[in-house]
Amino acid sequence: MGKKAIQFGGGNIGRGFVAEFLHAAGYEVVFIDVMDSVINSLQQTPSYDVTEVSEEGESTKTITNYRAINSKTHEADVVQEIASADVVTCAVGPNILKFIAPVIAKGIDARTEERPVAVIACENAIGATDTLHGYIKQHTNPDRLETLSERARFANSAIDRIVPNQPPNSGLNVRIEKFYEWAVEKTPFGEWGHPDIPAIHWVDHLEPYIERKLFTVNTGHATTAYYAHKRGKKMIAEALEDPEIRETVHKVLEETASLIVSKHEISEQEQKEYVDKIVSRISNPYLEDNVERVGRAPLRKLSRKERFIGPASQLAERGQKFDALLGAIEMALRFQNVPGDEESSELARILKENSAEDATSQLTGLEKDHPLYSHVVERVSTVQQGSKSVL
């Protein structure tokens, strides 16, 4: 029998990142989703194209050998597919992990294969597979918890690839940047060894990869979006042509670089080259990346371990500089009531209905005695008072 991978999430990242590389590794991909339109399209279309875009031009790969199941209406089928799968991946958004965990738990519990299934969450969040693992354990019979590792192994991953808004009428086809990084920890697989997926960079310690990516790519991308939104710019590449925005982004990334260099023993030169590469990537006009797409979901982006508070809190604890990050945090707080983004409306409500202190605690999860807390309270208060900000 051929190799089989179950991919939760039939969206752009699921189709244009994860499935592309699973397909290239020789897996049949079974997409699982709850969106009727996505499942119907996948079921009715035998192939779709992934077009990789770079300054050198475009190249297109055709993806075939996939099926699709609606887990809302055909849960038993999903359980059976997981029971005989080699790999389970997901790209559903960190907030959705708790909703996919019950069916994955049932599928794992139904396994009789000797080799445990590899579970890899492909989300923009630190420790996403650990989070999913925790939810799966909650939905596993206590008598079966002790032997769970015989049926499944869970490995965290760091993913890095920009997927912009897609042109209208693209159907299942995905335009995506050519560059990618997919790092996955290999230690959880132990004596079984990791799955054979050549696109994955298998590592012993994932945290340096996750933090470097999250605190450089995601911090830089979101900083650009929030300053651009304040200035009424529509596209990320256009925003980075503005010398003031570009300089501000570099200042933010100098601060996160100082954390990454001191914490993870990455050389200053290596991190500087990484930062330059990232700024060049997000400046790519061929991606046609939209400011509102990059800025959406500000509540998640302002949370405790995310791209702003995560590095700023660690810098504050280490007594290092975090002024530019505070500016980015303020700009994120100003991303309110953006059409089509519920979190930006919720952010506006929280800032309107709470004191600066309560809003800071609610939005960032910072403890009141944390060295960053009072600085963020100040910025929250500034935004609440409608004061004009610099830049």
Curated annotation (Swiss-Prot):
It is an enzyme of class 1 (oxidoreductase). It catalyses: D-mannitol 1-phosphate + NAD(+) = beta-D-fructose 6-phosphate + NADH + H(+). NAD(+) binds at residues 5-16. The active site is at residue 213. It comes from the Eukaryota. Keywords: NAD, Oxidoreductase. GO terms for cellular component: cytosol. Its EC number is 1.1.1.17. Catalyzes the NAD(H)-dependent interconversion of D-fructose 6-phosphate and D-mannitol 1-phosphate in the mannitol metabolic pathway. Monomer. This is Mannitol-1-phosphate 5-dehydrogenase. It comes from Aspergillus oryzae (strain ATCC 42149 / RIB 40) (Yellow koji mold). The lineage of its organism: Eukaryota, Fungi, Dikarya, Ascomycota, Pezizomycotina.
